[in-house]
């Protein structure tokens, strides 16, 4: 079974087992809904945890797990990655993609010149920014907008872009 990252536990909060999460999902209100199951890998084993509570605090998602309502029971989870199973993913409408589908795609210009590979997706504001690792050059920051992203081909594992003035 495949698992996909939806967040990272960065710290505890208070003494009642609340965890501070950096979200890696566009759907935190759905992903971290009480009753949902999240998975955490620990020494090669995948453990499941049921969410008891969720709230947003500043730029973080705050959750507690059922049965782990004490700081001493969650201290060891700091730094762990939160994942969902493939079955938990919802179908997206055409033209929308999960981050794991985009990361790793090869990037080509419209005239078929290889530019690099997408290594990360940042969400700084109005639109996502794709970080493209280039060989022998600094990373390229691509705004994920229609003027730049011309075609996403998951079958061919590539993205066709138009390099607008000032992007390179």
From Swiss-Prot:
Signal peptide: none
Keyword Signal in record: no
GO molecular function: ribosome binding
Keyword Chaperone attached: yes
GO cellular component: cytoplasm; ribosome
Primary location: cytoplasm
GO biological process: ribosomal small subunit biogenesis; rRNA processing
Domain PRC barrel: start-end pairs: 94-167
Keyword field: Chaperone, Cytoplasm, Ribosome biogenesis, rRNA processing
Family per record: Belongs to the RimM family.
Biological role: An accessory protein needed during the final step in the assembly of 30S ribosomal subunit, possibly for assembly of the head region. Essential for efficient processing of 16S rRNA. May be needed both before and after RbfA during the maturation of 16S rRNA. It has affinity for free ribosomal 30S subunits but not for 70S ribosomes.
Subunit-structure text: Binds ribosomal protein uS19.
Free-text note regarding domains: The PRC barrel domain binds ribosomal protein uS19.
Designated name of the protein: Ribosome maturation factor RimM
Organism: Ligilactobacillus salivarius (strain UCC118) (Lactobacillus salivarius)
Encoding gene per record: rimM
């Amino acid at each position: 079974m495949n698992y996909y990252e939806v967040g990272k536990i960065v710290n505890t909060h208070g003494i009642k087992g609340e965890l501070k999460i950096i979200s890696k999902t566009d759907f935190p209100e759905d992903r971290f809904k009480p009753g949902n199951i999240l998975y955490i890998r620990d020494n090669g084993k995948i453990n499941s945890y049921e969410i008891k509570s969720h709230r947003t605090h500043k730029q973080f998602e705050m959750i507690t797990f059922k049965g782990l309502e004490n700081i001493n029971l969650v201290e060891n989870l700091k730094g762990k990655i939160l994942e969902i199973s493939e079955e938990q993913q919802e179908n997206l409408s055409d033209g929308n993609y999960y981050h794991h589908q985009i990361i790793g795609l090869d990037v080509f210009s419209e005239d078929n010149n290889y530019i690099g590979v997408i290594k990360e997706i940042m969400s700084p504001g109005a639109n996502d920014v794709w970080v493209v690792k280039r060989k022998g050059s600094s990373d390229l920051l691509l705004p994920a907008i229609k003027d730049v992203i011309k075609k996403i081909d998951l079958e061919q594992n590539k993205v066709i872009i138009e390099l607008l003035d000032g992007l390179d």
